[in-house]
């Protein structure tokens, strides 16, 4: 595209052991799951508070 600068080639970082990648992936998935769980609990609480009559 005109006006865009060419992207510099990224230099590869140091290779990491597969175990490190698995641990990092597991941590990220856990954080993501915790956020979703918190949101669901919050929505359930709000729906109980604002539900009319029951």
UniProtKB/Swiss-Prot annotation:
Its main location: mitochondrion. Coiled coil: none annotated. It is found in: Mitochondrion. The keyword Mitochondrion applies. A motif (BH3) lies at residues 29-37. The BH3 motif is essential for pro-apoptotic activity. Promotes activation of caspases and apoptosis. Promotes mitochondrial membrane changes and efflux of apoptogenic proteins from the mitochondria. Contributes to p53/TP53-dependent apoptosis after radiation exposure. Promotes proteasomal degradation of MCL1. Competes with BAK1 and with BIM/BCL2L11 for binding to MCL1; can displace BAK1 and BIM/BCL2L11 from their binding sites. Interacts with MCL1. Interacts with BCL2A1. Interacts with BAX. Interacts with BCL2L10. This is Phorbol-12-myristate-13-acetate-induced protein 1. It comes from Canis lupus familiaris (Dog). The gene is PMAIP1.
